[in-house]
């Protein structure tokens, strides 16, 4: 295993650990999800470069586009949550169903 692969696995597990530890605020969960997606993007890019294929790099662009869409949807949900309830706590998400 290369050192880059080990670093991306470490970043991925740090993102998972951040989600498990910081379950109180919605913004911290969104940031940890972005960390997971960035580490996945980096590992797929390194894998495509090591495989010497340019076809796999288009999958990375699709992943990056979908992660930007996920971030914008999450931020819009957080803005709606903070405007209506003056809080970004995860416990207030259940109130949005009413």
Swiss-Prot record:
Protein name per its UniProtKB record: NADH-ubiquinone oxidoreductase chain 4L
EC number in record: 7.1.1.2
PANTHER family assigned to the protein according to its UniProt record, in alphabetical order: NADH-UBIQUINONE OXIDOREDUCTASE CHAIN 4L, NADH-UBIQUINONE OXIDOREDUCTASE SUBUNIT ND4L
Transmembrane segments: 1-21, 29-49, 61-81
Function: Core subunit of the mitochondrial membrane respiratory chain NADH dehydrogenase (Complex I) that is believed to belong to the minimal assembly required for catalysis. Complex I functions in the transfer of electrons from NADH to the respiratory chain. The immediate electron acceptor for the enzyme is believed to be ubiquinone.
Reaction catalysed by this enzyme: a ubiquinone + NADH + 5 H(+)(in) = a ubiquinol + NAD(+) + 4 H(+)(out)
Example GO biological process: ATP synthesis coupled electron transport
Subcellular location: Mitochondrion membrane
Gene: ND4L
Organism: Patiria pectinifera
Taxonomic placement: Eukaryota, Metazoa, Echinodermata, Eleutherozoa, Asterozoa
The keyword Transmembrane is annotated on this UniProt entry: yes
């Amino acid at each position: 295993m290369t050192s880059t692969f080990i670093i991306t696995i470490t970043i991925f597990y740090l993102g998972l650990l951040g989600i498990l530890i910081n379950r109180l605020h919605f913004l911290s969960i969104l940031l940890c999800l972005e960390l997971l997606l960035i580490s996945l993007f980096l590992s797929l890019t390194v894998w495509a470069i090591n495989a010497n294929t340019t076809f796999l790099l288009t999958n990375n662009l699709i992943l990056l586009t979908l992660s930007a869409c996920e971030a914008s949807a999450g931020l819009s949900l957080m803005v709606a949550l903070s405007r209506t309830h003056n809080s970004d706590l995860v416990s207030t998400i259940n109130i949005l169903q009413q």
